Amino acid sequence: MATEKNTLLSLILTAGITALVATGQKAEQPEVVTNYGSVRGYQVKVNAAERSVNVFLGLPFAKPPVGPLRFSEPQPPEPWKGVRDAASYPPMCLQDKVLGQYLSDAITNRKEKVRLQISEDCLYLNVYTPVSTEEQEKLPVFVWIHGGGLVSGAASSYDGSALAAFDNVVVVTIQYRLGIAGYFSTGDKHARGNWGYLDQVAALQWIQENIIHFRGDPGSVTIFGESAGGVSVSALVLSPLAKGLFHKAISESGTAVRILFTEQPEEQAQRIAAAAGCEKSSSAALVECLREKTEAEMEQITLKMPPMFISASLDGVFFPKSPRQLLSEKVINAVPYIIGVNNCEFGWILPRMMKFPEFTEGLEKDVARQVLQSTLALSFKGAPSDIVDLVYNEYIGVAENRAQVRDGLLDSIADPLFVFSAVEVARHHRDAGNPVYFYEFQHRPSSAAGVVPEFVKADHADEIAFVFGKPFLAGNATEEEAKLSRTVMKYWTNFARNGNPNGEGLVHWPQYDMDERYLEIDLTQKAAKKLKERKMEFWMQLTEQIMSDRRRKHTDL
């Protein structure tokens, strides 16, 4: 294994990309005065980019959301005197610590693994800003929103130094309350919910007020995120609370329709109440009971819940109407938008997290049908058996062996959760007159060899390594992958600067139009159109049928 790694490193070195590791030496201790007080960070050298980056970790953008502030809107942070140390990673928000660490280790773009603590006091952000010896214009700002199903994840899993160094941008990674602390709702005034989304708005407000001190341009902010982070970006594009706080948006493998949203949060609240021993006769009493739980008790309640146990909800504040209604009524923050998916979204990491039956060698049809029935509920709540039949016949019915059954099942889950949802949102934004660029990421990382089964192509989250320049920080990549990473970083940063990803030396990325043109991103890139056209038509018709059935039932009542 070590020999293979050395070979890969030498391949990259011979391509003229030197010393892949940001040194981490704290030779320089940069200080910045923010609106709340002074902070002292440290400097790293990204040798491959021949540039240093100033790093500031754990900057508070809100008061700790503890005690009476649990299930409350975030409040501005308290100012401090003296110089605050900003050289240590903040704790990640309350979550299943084992799952959170597993996800962090799986997706980090660093060479080393960062051991993360958990705490309810977690509303912090990290800033990476390139060093310059001369006064320059203000730099575009990237704000990364991590994924993790709204129940796990951490800002510190993502090192923004390579992106900042190579492309002369400021990178901010933010945290937000997760799980019960982040999205618990009683569906009324006692706990409206969406606390995590309100935290994201608070972080963006802090950035508007303070990023100028880090050479960032508050008038050029691009929000981007993956999975639940992509859903969050999509939600912020729809929320009136976020209007004017950002200027471009990128959703990677996640949009705010069909997943991680409910119009009936009371059902979630009842399950949480039962797990917490807080089954009360009123919403007010339930909220008070949960507020009295210690942090350790909240962690134990979280561990009793299934993997994807909570969603954002219709609160009348962050979401005045459902995401689908806001989209259809074109009530959208008008910004250029990149939306994309990977070509094997439900290939490996998500089925494992959701404790799928062993599927590596294939599946029997009866097992696949049972799994399909349970997972369809993620996309279509209360899907009747005839809907299950239609999806089964479309994806699995014609399969001739266990491997084809497995592949059909995985696609039947990925397509509605990720692909069709992304296409739907892209169409709405296009029709509202906003510039949209769509992609499908197709590259299976070389680091997957011997770890991820060969049938998995570009799995959920695989693109993150290339967006954040992992080949230049962690190595373990081929020369072609280093080139791909630079290509993706250039597309993203061109978009942040100009609202258009295209630039010199890049394959032309067409705007998403009525021909639904998009970019296939692999070791080489090419334009294509109408991603999965037949399957998308299938899901469009099925969605219309389900909504028509619901309207008819509602009318009958």
Curated annotation (Swiss-Prot):
Domain of life: Eukaryota
Keyword Repeat belongs to the record: no
Record-linked SUPFAM superfamilies: alpha/beta-Hydrolases
PANTHER family: CARBOXYLESTERASE
Organism, scientific name: Anas platyrhynchos (Mallard)
Gene3D superfamilies found in the cross-reference section: alpha/beta hydrolase
Entry-linked InterPro entries: AB_hydrolase_fold, CarbesteraseB, Carboxylesterase_B_AS, Carboxylesterase_B_CS, Type-B_Carboxylest/Lipase
Keywords assigned: Disulfide bond, Fatty acid biosynthesis, Fatty acid metabolism, Glycoprotein, Hydrolase, Lipid biosynthesis, Lipid metabolism, Signal
Tissue expression from the record: Highest levels in uropygial gland, much lower in liver and kidney.
Pfam families linked to this entry: COesterase (PF00135)
Enzyme nomenclature, EC number: 3.1.2.-
Protein name: Fatty acyl-CoA hydrolase precursor, medium chain
Family designation: Belongs to the type-B carboxylesterase/lipase family.
Disulfide bridge positions per record: 93-122
Active-site residues, Swiss-Prot/TrEMBL: 227, 345, 460
